[in-house]
Amino acid sequence: MKNPELIIIGAGPGGIAAAVEAARAGVTVKILDENPKPGGRIYGQLNDGFKLLNPGFLGPDYEKGKVLLSEFDTIREKIDYRHDALVFATFENRIMAFHQAGKGQRLPFNKLILATGAYDRPVPFPGWTLPGVLTAGGAQTLVKMQRVLPGKNILFAGSGPLQLVVANQVLDGGGTVAAILEAGEINNWLKLLKGFSRNWGLLTDGLQYVRTIRKAGVPLLRRHMILEAHGDRQVEEAVIAEVDKDWRAIEKTRRILKVDTICLGYGLVPSVELTRLVGCQHRYAADLGGWIPARNEDMETSVPGVFAVGDGAGVAGSAMAMLEGRIAGISTAQSLGYISSEEARKRKKPYLNDMKKMGRLRDALDRISYPRPGLFELAHDDTIICRCEELTLGDIKSAIGKGTTEMNALKRMTRMGMGRCQGRMCAPAVQEIIAGQTQTPAAQIEYLNQRPPTKLVPIKVLESLPGEFEIRHGW
């Protein structure tokens, strides 16, 4: 299948759902995914050599994912599925570049669905670079995929249900959880889920997580946050405190917990590197993770024929990602003439209805758990913000004080975002720092320009790319 009609980047819930709908309609589909197996972060399958003895250990989402993966298997022979294939660039004239097995390849695209997912929000605070501080998502990968505990005495700090999920998996794996700090009001989102109990089974799952945690004797502290981590060569203790409605510490409530691991779960940031590179218009939505591509009801972006689905287009969870993927797959089939507009409307209707119901729930959850200003005020002047270039908050504030109040200008002046992570670990925080220092809404602070490659690739891969490429203006 040299020239597929549709290319899908990402084989998580959104990408797989899109592939299923498009292939069923007759569209020739190629999927490029950087992981060894389909499923993405939520529905990811165990690595070779591991056997799942207790399916319940991976949680209800894993079981839901098996249904989607079974659908995928039924149309697998109709799809050109490439695993371990990393897309790292797009160019003018609708050309993309990816590498697989150490070889660079170029590929023209007509219709494109981007299902690139999201990554854990980085939260700088004193001590966050110590060994033993990791994200809840990273801890979940260790526990789910390798059956390895992230530490011996673990503190969870964040907001929202994800850290409850991971804490349950740690407990099930024999780990010790010192405490769970919920920055928001956990009773609020449990009551909220009760109001939506007819949909998605979220109430049952959430209550079961809380029951397990309380049965294990783990303190579940609402309106609490991590302030600092201390230790010589690794985490040895954490400073925590109660916080107000803006997540600012109530100083008199400070106390110290003896722990060796801190797992942070303050939400996700959409991976928009490829949507930016393609040239899609973006808008800022704090409740959906930050900058996201603007889309219409068909999930199509401002670039004709380019669609975006899942957490990479706004963090809303795996259930929403599947719905968006199905709609994008059907819309693609319609645009290519495989189904009529009437048939497309018929197929999309139940998914659109479910999206509206799910959207109301997500909006309400986001109002409770999205980051408040105090989260971005934890760092001190000597706290490293850009880990790659070892830039501190003081360095960034100094540059801002000299009039450098734009992200790209700050990058040129300080080298912020020029390291291996390409800004993923620092740019979201720097945007909030600029907003706070200049009293400017984050939505008005333009994000970093995107350039290829979007992820690190070996030089030999670039050397092996055939032909020449035209770089889009504005980089």
Where are these regions (language model features)?
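Residues forming the flavin
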Residues: 1-420, 424-475
